[in-house]
Amino acid sequence: MDSEFFQPVYPRHYGECLSPTSTPSFFSTHMCTILVAIVVLIIIIIVLIYLFSSRKKKAAAPAIEEEDIQFINPYQDQQWAGATPQPGTSKPAGATTGNVGKPITDRPATDRPVTNNPVTDRLIMATGGPAAASAPSAELYTTATTQNTASQTMPAVEALRQRSTYTHKDLENSL
């Protein structure tokens, strides 16, 4: 065995061992580690606050898909005013003829005021008010007996015309 590996190591000056030295404090020895830990904790807290705030926003706003959006067409009767009906079909109550911009003046008398606004007039009719209960006489309307080939080839559009609310896909399919 080599004897040089087993030789005791002595301090150069015996006074170094005997001098009173204070041990450094925990904060001074681990200051860098503590600062890094504080910065990491602050970053984690900021990320958690951001994640929870975005979840609350998503939960508060209902998830609306394209199929759930309904479009209400206030000019439902008026947009088809130029098209002539098919023979054998009758005009729905409250439908206009060719007077798109003119108010309907020959309505049945009701206790509700006439607004000349198609949106509110249709809402009054849809809620089952007095206007919906008393249907106008058939003498007020004249039906045209001309042949309309375009409406014969589009039964889906005709079905949409009868409804008051439309989905996004219905509108795409009708175009």
UniProtKB/Swiss-Prot annotation:
Region feature (Disordered): 79-121
Keywords of this entry: Apoptosis, Host cytoplasm, Host cytoskeleton, Host endoplasmic reticulum, Host membrane, Host-virus interaction, Membrane, Microtubular outwards viral transport, Transmembrane, Transmembrane helix, Viral envelope protein, Viral release from host cell, Virion
Topological relation to the membrane, as annotated: Single-pass membrane protein
InterPro entries linked to this entry: ASFV_p54
Entry's transmembrane regions: 32-52
One annotated Gene Ontology cellular component of this protein: membrane
Signal peptide interval: none
Presence of the UniProt keyword rRNA processing in the record: no
Biased composition (Polar residues): 79-89
Interaction with host DYNLL1, as annotated region: 141-153
A Pfam family: ASFV_J13L
UniProt-listed GO biological process terms: microtubule-dependent intracellular transport of viral material towards cell periphery
Signals that turn on the gene: Expressed in the late phase of the viral replicative cycle.
Compartments where located: Virion membrane; Host cytoplasm, Host cytoskeleton; Host endoplasmic reticulum membrane
Function comment: Inner envelope protein involved, through its interaction with host dynein, in the intracellular microtubule-dependent transport of viral capsid toward viral factories. Seems to induce caspase-3 activation and apoptosis. Plays a role in virion morphogenesis by recruiting and transforming the host ER membranes into the precursors of the viral envelope. Involved in virus attachment to the host cell.
Subunit relationships: Interacts with the host light chain cytoplasmic dynein DYNLL1; this interaction is critical for intracellular microtubule-dependent virus transport toward viral factories.
Family: Belongs to the asfivirus envelope protein p54 family.
Protein name: Inner membrane protein p54
Organism the protein comes from: African swine fever virus (isolate Pig/Kenya/KEN-50/1950) (ASFV)
Taxonomic placement: Viruses, Varidnaviria, Bamfordvirae, Nucleocytoviricota, Pokkesviricetes
